[in-house]
């Protein structure tokens, strides 16, 4: 009888440990994706810029190391305003998932000129206030991917 209780206790402990590990993993992955989103797309201090802004920021944010990232958008809003987009109505993402949200923000779109080589990539800048779509995950939801 004692061995059965001991076995059940160990089994319960194992299940709880595995469950705990399962809960930790997604939040770590989500945080990594959130940090990547911040690095690649958020620049709240700037109001946008010219071609030189894109050239400097793309290099500074490590998107020109191996090859030139062809297109990137920097959002010029406070992170809390961007996170607020995650509380809007869910819409369909390009990948078919329903975890995207849209909002209107100030942006700089950086498009690679097509005739540069990494790490000295060259970009054309276009600033505007426009609709963006971002994917959000977690509880509370945070932006993890720039969809369009």
From Swiss-Prot:
GO cellular component: extracellular space
Disulfide bond sites: 54-110, 68-121, 86-136, 93-100
Catalytic-site annotation from UniProt: 41 (proton acceptor), 145 (proton donor)
Location of Pyrrolidone carboxylic acid modifications: 30
Recorded superkingdom: Eukaryota
Residues annotated to bind dUMP: 36, 41, 69, 72-73, 146
GO molecular function terms listed in the Swiss-Prot or TrEMBL record: endonuclease activity; nucleic acid binding
CDD domains: RNase_A_canonical
Gene3D superfamilies: Ribonuclease A-like domain (3.10.130.10)
InterPro entries assigned: RNaseA, RNaseA-like_dom_sf, RNaseA_AS, RNaseA_domain
Subcellular location: Secreted
EC nos: 3.1.27.-
Tissue expression summary: Expressed in the cortical tubules of the kidney (at protein level). Also expressed in the medullary tubules of the kidney.
Signal peptide extent: 1-29
A Pfam family annotated for this UniProt entry: RnaseA
EC class (word): hydrolase
Statement: the UniProt record of this protein carries the keyword Membrane: no
Annotated GO biological process: antibacterial humoral response; cellular response to starvation
Keywords in alphabetical order: Antibiotic, Antimicrobial, Disulfide bond, Endonuclease, Hydrolase, Nuclease, Pyrrolidone carboxylic acid, Secreted, Signal
UniProt record similarity statement: Belongs to the pancreatic ribonuclease family.
Purpose of the protein: Cleaves preferentially after uridine bases. Has antimicrobial activity against uropathogenic E.coli (UPEC). Probably contributes to urinary tract sterility.
Protein name: Ribonuclease 4
């Amino acid at each position: 009888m004692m061995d059965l209780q001991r076995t059940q206790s160990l089994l319960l402990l194992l299940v709880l440990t595995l469950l705990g590990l399962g809960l930790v993993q997604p939040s770590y992955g989500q945080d990594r994706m959130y940090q990547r989103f911040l690095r690649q797309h958020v620049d709240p201090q700037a109001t946008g810029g010219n071609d030189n802004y894109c050239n400097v920021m793309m290099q500074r944010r490590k998107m020109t190391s191996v090859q030139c990232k062809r297109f990137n958008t920097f959002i010029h809003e406070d992170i809390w305003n961007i996170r607020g987009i995650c509380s809007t109505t869910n819409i369909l993402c390009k990948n078919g998932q329903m975890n995207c949200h849209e909002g209107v923000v100030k942006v700089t779109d950086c498009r690679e000129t097509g005739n540069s080589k990494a790490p000295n990539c060259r970009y054309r800048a276009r600033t505007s206030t426009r609709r963006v779509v971002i994917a959000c995950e977690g509880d509370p939801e945070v932006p993890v991917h720039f969809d369009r």
